[in-house]
Amino acid sequence: MDIEDVILLIEKIMINQTGRTLSDTDITVIKGLHEGLTYSAIAENHNYHDGYVGEKSRSLYRVMTAELGYPVTKHNFRWVIDRMEIMRKRERRVKQARKRLSR
């Protein structure tokens, strides 16, 4: 999944769970996590404190965990995103199959 799709997917989750959209900092952190960067690397690249990046990340993980029903962490973030893409593709195929069967 490309980064723009990841951001849109997480923003949809954020809106569902909190009623708010992603901040610029959230998007920066998501991009860094998607690239596999450490909190320190994300912080250094964008002039943030690494503790702040960690806090923002954990906040995103909590929201994603609440929406998805299973724990999201820095260790499984990429796996979760990949899994969500697989599920999204399956849902599309099921909808297409149902549409064909209903004709």
Regions found by a protein language model. Give the residues of each.
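Helix-turn-helix/homeodomain-like alpha-helical modules used for DNA recognition
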Residues: R83-R103
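An N-terminal, helix-rich hydrophobic module
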Residues: M1-R90
